[in-house]
């Protein structure tokens, strides 16, 4: 999987945003996709969301959470938003870096290739922090393997939609988010695995600000083929010695 997957040779317009409401960001994606189809640039949005659950098209009724509350006083209800992306239900919130590439794919379309490139970019960022991660066959996203009595743990989720050869939605990398938010759901419909974060695995705080520049570079390089997709058969926390 080398060479660019994009139809354009122009650079990607990377927009580093702050905290953006999910519905606002979703409309932003649709507007950017319309603009891209009309000849505008490829764009990568990097941001955080206030706490929200998003349900992909394959979410079953029993997988939706009951009332969940957040906020300092625990009295702010967390919304559940139905989306048009693939996959099932997940959580977004503070401490999680969300990326939305709005990219016109080259022909012939290869959505699996596109997803593998997103995974590769997040595997690269994790490795540069000292954490080896990998793919799991049959499951999208980036994972820590089972070991020491712990199940496989997802550190980054991916859910995309491609319409008019243009991508929407994207990925979510858990940096220093509240992992308890995932306990109200079966994340992505996978009941035999866990969820983790960079901070939890590395034993130190790894905030969104620390990784957002590296994620932007890695995603752009992966989409353009400068970061090739590789096999990652094993994964562990790299030794500091």
UniProtKB/Swiss-Prot annotation:
InterPro entries: aa-tRNA-synth_II/BPL/LPL, BPL_LPL_catalytic, Octanoyltransferase, Octanoyltransferase_CS
Pathway terms, separated by semicolons: Protein modification; protein lipoylation via endogenous pathway; protein N(6)-(lipoyl)lysine from octanoyl-[acyl-carrier-protein]: step 1/2
Keywords: Acyltransferase, Cytoplasm, Transferase
Pfam entry (one): LplA-B_cat
Annotated BPL/LPL catalytic domain residues: 38-227
One GO biological process term: protein modification process
An example Gene Ontology molecular-function term: lipoyl(octanoyl) transferase activity
Compartments it resides in: Cytoplasm
EC nos: 2.3.1.181
Top-rank lineage group of the source organism: Bacteria
Site (Lowers pKa of active site Cys) residue list: 154
HAMAP family, A to Z: LipB
Function: Catalyzes the transfer of endogenously produced octanoic acid from octanoyl-acyl-carrier-protein onto the lipoyl domains of lipoate-dependent enzymes. Lipoyl-ACP can also act as a substrate although octanoyl-ACP is likely to be the physiological substrate.
Family indicated by similarity: Belongs to the LipB family.
Comment field (misc): In the reaction, the free carboxyl group of octanoic acid is attached via an amide linkage to the epsilon-amino group of a specific lysine residue of lipoyl domains of lipoate-dependent enzymes.
Protein known as: Octanoyltransferase
Species classification: Bacteria, Bacillati, Actinomycetota, Actinomycetes, Mycobacteriales
């Amino acid at each position: 999987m080398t060479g660019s997957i994009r139809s354009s040779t122009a650079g990607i317009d990377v927009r580093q945003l702050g905290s953006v409401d999910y519905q606002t960001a979703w409309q932003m994606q649709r507007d950017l996709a319309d603009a891209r189809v009309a000849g505008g640039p490829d764009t990568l949005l990097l941001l955080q969301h206030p706490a929200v659950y998003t349900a992909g098209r394959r979410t079953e009724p029993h997988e939706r959470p009951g009332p969940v509350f957040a906020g300092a006083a625990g009295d702010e209800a967390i919304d559940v938003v139905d989306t048009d992306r693939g996959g099932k239900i997940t959580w977004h919130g503070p401490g999680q870096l969300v990326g939305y590439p709005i990219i016109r794919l080259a022909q012939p379309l290869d959505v699996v290739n596109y997803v593998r490139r997103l995974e590769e970019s997040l595997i690269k960022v994790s490795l540069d922090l000292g954490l080896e991660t990998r793919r799991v066959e049959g499951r999208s996203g980036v994972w820590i393997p089972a070991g020491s009595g712990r199940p496989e743990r997802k550190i980054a989720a991916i859910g995309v939609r491609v319409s008019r050869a243009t991508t929407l939605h994207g990925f979510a990398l858990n940096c220093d988010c509240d992992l308890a938010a995932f306990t109200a759901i079966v994340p992505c419909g996978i009941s035999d695995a866990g969820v983790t974060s960079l901070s939890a695995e590395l034993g130190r705080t790894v905030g969104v600000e620390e990784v957002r520049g590296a994620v932007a570079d890695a995603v752009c390089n992966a989409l353009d083929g400068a970061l090739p997709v590789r096999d990652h058969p094993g994964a562990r926390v790299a030794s500091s010695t």
